């Protein structure tokens, strides 16, 4: 069974179109499947519209009133899914529903555990993207190359074998649940070419906050992937601040207090050592301390 997860917020017009489109793909390809709409309590009635399809097609709707956000909605979808394979896609029709069979086939054939819809492989692309948006997408992808080999790390179109999520602690921030799953599970991944289309109805959710969340999320994933390297970087940063503290205390005691430079140096050194010890303990090596 295939579970298609649609995270939604104010997608009333699009949900009317995407659910019948998915139903047609299931019927044409003889796929046994369901659609799970996880809605963040949309004021435009998205959840109610989605529920209306339940009489003719296996659609389940879950409305979340707290802890909102795209990635958290998808995680709830994983929890609710009855299928062995979960397909995650945007509800705004930017991801081609006709590609669902291509997304699940490699997993069913045992070739991989995750497929990711890619705009950056042969056969993929994006309709009418301006140069600036292409540059932002490429730049965001390059920043993620240290944690994944995906050709399109910022993709939101994914199929995943649900069993690989068992025991994996997913803690996404923002909207890149695909990147979270791929990095945390270290699964076998296959790229599937897709042509991305901009939404026709509704407003994009990609604002400044989403971009900042992406950078913060990347920081978490780098820390997960390279924990020792991160501790080393923190240790070096604390060392630099300790040098500043040492110098500031020394200058203050000599120039403003008039203390003998030899005694001032000893006091400054002791202060810097204490500073470094405290901050290394509570920040640089916090993971080891909590373990």
Locate each region found by the language model.
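Hydrophobic helical membrane-anchoring modules
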Residues: 1, 147, 170-251, 255-256, ...
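Short, well-formed alpha-helical segments that are part of the catalytic scaffolds
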Residues: 11-26
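Donor nucleotide-sugar binding loop of glycosyltransferases
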Residues: 11-14, 42, 70, 96
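Conserved donor nucleotide-binding strand/loop of the catalytic core
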Residues: 32-37, 47-80
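A conserved acidic beta->alpha catalytic loop
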Residues: 39-47, 93
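Acceptor/aglycone-binding surface of glycosyltransferases and processive sugar-polymer synthases
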Residues: 62-80, 85, 97-175, 199-209, ...
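Membrane-interface starts of transmembrane alpha-helices
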Residues: 259-268
């Amino acid at each position: 069974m295939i579970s298609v997860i649609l995270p939604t917020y104010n997608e009333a017009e699009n949900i009317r179109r995407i659910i019948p489109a998915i139903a047609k793909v299931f019927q044409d390809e003889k796929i046994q499947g369901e659609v799970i709409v996880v809605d963040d309590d949309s004021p435009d009635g998205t959840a109610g519209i989605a529920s209306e399809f339940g009489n003719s097609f296996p659609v389940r709707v879950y409305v979340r009133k707290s802890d909102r956000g795209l990635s958290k909605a998808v995680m709830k979808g994983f929890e609710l899914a009855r299928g062995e394979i979960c397909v995650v896609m945007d509800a705004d029709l930017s991801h081609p529903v006709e590609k669902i069979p291509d997304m699940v086939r490699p997993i069913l054939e045992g070739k991989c555990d995750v497929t990711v819809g890619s705009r950056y492989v042969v056969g993929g692309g994006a309709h009418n993207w301006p140069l600036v948006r292409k540059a932002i997408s490429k730049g965001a992808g390059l920043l993620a190359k240290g944690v994944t080999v995906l050709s399109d790390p910022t993709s939101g179109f994914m199929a995943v074998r649900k069993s690989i999520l068992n025991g994996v602690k997913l803690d996404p921030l923002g909207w890149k649940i695909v990147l979270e799953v791929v990095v945390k599970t270290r699964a076998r991944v296959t790229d599937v070419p897709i042509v991305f289309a901009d939404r026709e109805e509704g407003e994009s959710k990609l604002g400044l906050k989403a971009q900042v969340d992406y950078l913060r999320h990347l920081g978490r994933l780098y820390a997960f992937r390279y924990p020792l390297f991160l501790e080393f970087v923190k240790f070096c940063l604390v060392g630099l601040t300790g040098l500043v503290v040492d110098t500031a205390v020394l200058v203050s005691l000599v120039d403003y207090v008039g203390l003998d430079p030899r005694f001032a140096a000893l006091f400054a050194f002791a202060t810097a050592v204490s500073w470094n010890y405290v901050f290394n303990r509570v920040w640089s090596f916090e993971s080891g301390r909590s373990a």
